Amino acid sequence: MSRVGKSPIALQGAEVKLADGAITVKGPLGTITQAINPLVNVANNDGTLNLAPVDESREANALSGTMRAIIANAVHGVTKGFERKLTLVGVGYRAQAQGDKLNLSLGFSHPVVHQMPEGVKAETPTQTEIVIKGINKQQVGQVAAEVRGYRPPEPYKGKGVRYSDEVVILKETKKK
C-alpha cells in the first residue's frame, strides 16, 4: 500500500460529507467538492479520514496516495488557505491589484491585465510584490504560473517576475 495513502488526514475543524462518489470539505474559508475515484475507499473516523485501495492492484494503490494528498490539500485550503508570493525585479516593473484584476506593467508597450478566476485573490503589499491567495492549491499555483509567464526571469540580469523563494542562476556574459 502507498506510504502516503496509509497516513490518516486530521480534519482540523473542517466538516466532511461523503456522498455518491464525491467528498465535500467545508471550513471557515469556503467549501471544496472533490470527486473520489471508485478504486479508493474513504472512511470518516471521529475527526480523521482514512483512505484505502479497493483491491491490491497497482493502480488502486497509486490512486489512494493521490486521493489522500488531494483531500489533505482541500482540508488545509478550507482551514488555513494557500498563498504564493511573487516578486517583480526590473526598472519600472509594477503591479497593482484592483478588485478581481491584476494590472502589471512589465516593460511592454501596453499594460498587462490579468483576470483573476473565482476563488483566487491577489494582493499587492508593495508595487513589486504580489501575493496570490485562495483555498484551492492547484488554482493558486496555476494563477501564479500564469502571472510569472508574462515575463519569466531572464538569465543575464535576472529581470522579470519570479517566485519569492525562487533562485535565479545568472549566466556570465560573453567575453571577447
From Swiss-Prot:
Single GO MF annotation: structural constituent of ribosome
Keyword Ion transport on entry: no
Coiled coil: none
Domain of life: Bacteria
Transmembrane segments: none
Biological process, per Gene Ontology: cytoplasmic translation
Gene Ontology CC entries for this record: cytosolic large ribosomal subunit
UniProtKB keywords: Ribonucleoprotein, Ribosomal protein, RNA-binding, rRNA-binding
PROSITE patterns per UniProt: RIBOSOMAL_L6_1
Pfam families noted in UniProt: Ribosomal_L6
HAMAP family named among the record's database cross-references: Ribosomal_uL6_B (MF_01365_B)
Entry function: This protein binds to the 23S rRNA, and is important in its secondary structure. It is located near the subunit interface in the base of the L7/L12 stalk, and near the tRNA binding site of the peptidyltransferase center.
Family in the record: Belongs to the universal ribosomal protein uL6 family.
Assembly behavior: Part of the 50S ribosomal subunit.
Identification of the protein by name: Large ribosomal subunit protein uL6
Source organism per UniProt: Burkholderia lata (strain ATCC 17760 / DSM 23089 / LMG 22485 / NCIMB 9086 / R18194 / 383)
Lineage: Bacteria, Pseudomonadati, Pseudomonadota, Betaproteobacteria, Burkholderiales
